[in-house]
A protein has these predicted regions:
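Short runs of predominantly hydrophobic/aromatic residues within well-ordered alpha helices
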Residues: 44, 91, 95, 241-244, ...
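Conserved hydrophobic residue
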Residues: 56-57, 271, 386, 408
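Generic, well-ordered alpha-helical scaffold segments in large soluble proteins
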Residues: 47, 51, 68-75, 97, ...
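Charged, flexible cofactor/metal-binding loops and thiol motifs
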Residues: 123, 127, 135, 150, ...
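Residue-level "edge-of-site" marker
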Residues: 64-65, 232, 394, 415
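A helix-coil-helix interface module used to build multimeric assemblies
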Residues: 2-208, 213-217, 226, 279-283, ...
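Short, well-ordered beta-strand elements within core beta-sheets of diverse protein domains
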Residues: 47-57, 173, 242-250, 377-385
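Glycine-rich cofactor/substrate-binding loops
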Residues: 2-43, 101-105, 286-463
């Protein structure tokens, strides 16, 4: 084995001068893509097994390559592998080390493939694996949310529109809204697997190959459903990256929304949520402070996820077919979004375990702001043969009356209510009871306690 060959870039027989130092700095991606070493080695092993099956390489060469690749994987895992920026990326670092271990036979590993199809194969396998990890963390968040909801089915609070009291709800119903969102996030990540399940390996640089390869074989070996259909599209395609980044962004947005609400609700003005000392920080100057820094961190990180998505969209928008160096950034963007989301899910799960509702304050706030006004309008429609619009107008007059008298709706007596609607009897007074209000919303998906219990059981059975 010629020693000088292993110390040079693979293309040095064509390009005679060494790259400038600035180009070497910009051109290498090993600090980023070394995370793909397992996927890269797995893909290479499947590839050489296929080459042997198709009688493109010998049994001896196949075994030597697999031996070398297995040894390299152990070296990297045990932190005994020396990554060299001179060799640019994970693919060439592994190939160069393979030459050192088994000699010139290492040159057969790249038969009938290119780094163009190699890197997409690696990244697809990595995202498939990461999707499972994200969904496992989403399962934990859903489980913690269900647990908190189950404890608070009969905890009554105001539901808000425009951040103003709207109608009474169960705190559990509010939490179950986020169970729905996080469940959709899980489904969104899972649905992405369809596009991830097409095998890029074997399309080579952009045209396919003249070797008699079997792409169905490598598809099966690597856990793909089928090979991709068009070689040019395959090396150009980063739709699967966009799908992943979009899913991360939507999930981050859901986390940000509930973080924002918990920040507001834990503030002195609302005082609806108690945050444990385990998840708050103090102030360097104000001794009394307990700040929701972790929630603020989660809220801020959604912006990072959006930025990663827009970065990738912007990279792709002007690229002709097929492969360009612009695409080198895809891996860093994916890793950054992935790591941020998994970290946020773990943090949020801890927050859920260390948060509790201030039940008394929730009820007090729900009992203000004329929150049962809609219940009165519905009562008039059902019991006094009014159209909803007429009942709405009558109820608005009742609210005006209560406001004028500085009373809650529940504090108005029957005689006062009859000023607006003379036909009213004592049975109208029950509509102002908050528990009755909540439990009257029995329509599917509504906030009635029985509905919530059924929905919690439904999700618990899914786990």
């Amino acid at each position: 084995m010629a020693k000088n060959k292993n110390n040079q870039a693979i293309w040095n027989t064509r390009i005679k001068k060494n790259a400038s130092s600035i180009f070497q700095k910009v051109g290498n991606s090993i600090d980023i893509d070394k995370r793909l070493y397992k996927e890269d080695i797995r893909g290479s092993i499947a590839h050489v097994e296929m080459l042997f099956k198709q009688k493109i390489i010998s049994f001896k060469i196949k075994n030597k390559i697999i031996y070398g690749l297995t040894k390299i994987e152990k070296e990297i895992f045990n932190k005994k592998f020396e990554f060299n920026k001179k060799y640019e990326d994970i693919h060439m670092n592994i190939e160069k080390r393979l030459f050192q271990i088994i000699g010139e036979e290492a040159g057969y590993v790249h038969t009938a493939r290119s780094r163009n199809d190699q890197v997409i194969t690696d990244l697809k396998i990595w995202i498939k694996s990461s999707t499972k990890e994200i969904n496992l963390n989403l399962d934990k968040v859903i489980k913690s949310t269900l647990k908190l909801a189950e404890k608070n089915i009969d905890t009554i609070m105001p539901g808000f529109t425009h951040l103003k009291n709207a109608q009474a709800i169960s705190f559990a119903h509010y939490l179950m809204a986020y169970v729905e969102m996080f469940n959709r996030d899980k489904n969104r990540f899972t649905n992405n697997l369809d596009n991830l399940n097409e095998n890029p390996l074997g399309v080579a640089a952009l045209t396919g190959t003249s070797f008699n390869i079997d792409r169905n074989y490598t598809s099966k070996k690597l856990g793909f459903k089928k090979p991709t259909n068009n070689s040019i599209d395959t090396v150009s395609d980063r739709d699967f990256v966009l799908d992943f980044l979009y899913s991360v962004s939507v999930c981050s947005m859901h986390i940000s929304r509930i973080a924002e609400e918990l920040i507001i609700w834990s503030s002195d003005g609302f005082n609806l949520i108690n945050l444990s000392d385990k998840i708050v920080t103090g102030s360097s100057i104000m001794p009394q402070k307990k700040n929701p820094d972790l929630l603020e961190y989660l809220r801020g990180k959604s912006g990072s996820s959006y930025g990663n998505l827009f970065s990738m969209l912007t990279i792709l928008k002007g690229l002709p077919l097929s492969y360009f160096k612009d695409l080198q950034d895809d891996k860093e963007i994916v890793f950054r979004s992935n790591d941020t989301l998994i970290n946020c899910l773990k943090i949020f799960n801890e927050i859920l375990k260390n948060s509790s509702p201030n039940k008394k304050r929730m009820f007090e706030l729900a009992n203000s702001g004329y929150i049962t006004a809609t219940d009165l309008a519905d009562f008039l429609v059902k019991n006094h043969s009014m159209s909803f619009r007429k009942a709405y107008q009558k109820t608005a007059l009742v609210v005006n009356l209560a406001e004028k008298k500085k009373k809650k709706l529940s504090e108005l007596n029957l005689e006062e209510l009859k000023i607006i609607e003379p036909k009213l009897t004592n049975d109208v007074l029950k509509v102002f009871d908050l528990k009755n209000s909540v439990n009257s919303k029995k329509s599917y998906g509504g906030t009635a306690f029985d509905n919530i219990k059924k929905m919690i059981m439904k999700y618990k059975k899914q786990k």
